Structures are given as C-alpha cells and as structure tokens.
C-alpha cells in the first residue's frame, strides 16, 4: 500500500502545481477589470486604426468605413491591454479597391450608412501587436 502512495506523489504534486499556476494566471488576467480611464491618445488612435482596418478587411461592403466617433472606451490590464470600445462608424465614398486616399468623405446620399460597433481588442502596445477578439455592429 505504501508503494502505491509513493507512486501517486509525483502526479499529485504536478496536479497541485498546475492548479496553483492556473489560479495565479486567472488572477493576473482579470486584474482590476475594465475601467473607464483616460487612455493615451496614441494608444487609442492606434487601437481604433487597427479596428477599422480589421472591420474593412472582413466587411463585404464595396466601400470603406471610417470611425466617426468614440462613444465609450474602457481598458483592462492583463498580460497586455484589453480595450472594450464602442464606436460609431460610417460608410465613406472611397471604394475598397481604389488606391487609398488621404481623406475619404462620408456618404451623404442613399448609400449613407452608420453602424454602432462594440469591440474587444487585445493589444500589446509596446510591441505594436493587436488582435480583434470580438466585434458586434448594428445599424444606428
């Protein structure tokens, strides 16, 4: 019987270490929760630029969209920074297949379309790394 108990020591120790490590990781990842903080202009601009580029790449629309307004911005520190943003975006007059123009005016005719999007973006700003984790848009 003692031999069986010795044989279980290492697996049980490994299980204990795994549980402790996972508890620490989960604690770190949820450190503080989302907060409405004044985000640096540079970080929010690069995050919104990443968002709209991702949205345009995934969209089946012929026209490009641009961010019209940041409605709400929250951030949470994890292993990087998670941004929970709500933005209003609008369809522009620039087509996707055209050479990118410095300025794309918004549609003003029957093609006018605005969306409210709520997105979760993971970022490691000091490494210029962004990933769109979740996005949901509805017509406004």
Swiss-Prot record:
Tissue: Highly expressed in testis where it localizes to spermatogonium, spermatocyes and round spermatids. Not detected in spermatozoa. Also detected in epididymis, cerebrum and pituitary.
Domain Cystatin per the UniProt entry, residue ranges: 32-126
Chief location of this protein within or outside the cell: secreted
Keyword Secreted: yes
GO MF entry, a single one: cysteine-type peptidase activity
Residues carrying a glycan: 45
Signal peptide range: 1-23
Name recorded for this polypeptide: Cystatin-like 1
Organism: Mus musculus (Mouse)
Gene (name only): Cstl1
């Amino acid at each position: 019987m003692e031999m069986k108990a010795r044989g279980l020591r290492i697996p049980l120790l490994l299980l204990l270490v795994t549980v402790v490590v996972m508890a620490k990781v989960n604690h770190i990842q949820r450190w503080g929760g989302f907060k409405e903080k004044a985000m640096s202009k540079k970080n929010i601009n690069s995050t919104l630029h990443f968002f709209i580029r991702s949205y345009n790449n995934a969209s089946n629309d012929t026209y490009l969209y641009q961010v019209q307004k940041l409605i709400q911005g929250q951030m949470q520190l994890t292993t990087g920074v998670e941004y929970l943003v709500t933005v209003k975006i609008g369809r522009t007059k620039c087509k996707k297949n055209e050479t990118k123009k410095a300025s794309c005016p918004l549609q003003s005719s029957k093609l006018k379309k605005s969306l409210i999007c709520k997105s979760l973006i993971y970022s490691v700003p000091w490494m210029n790394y962004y990933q769109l984790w979740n996005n949901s848009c509805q017509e406004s």
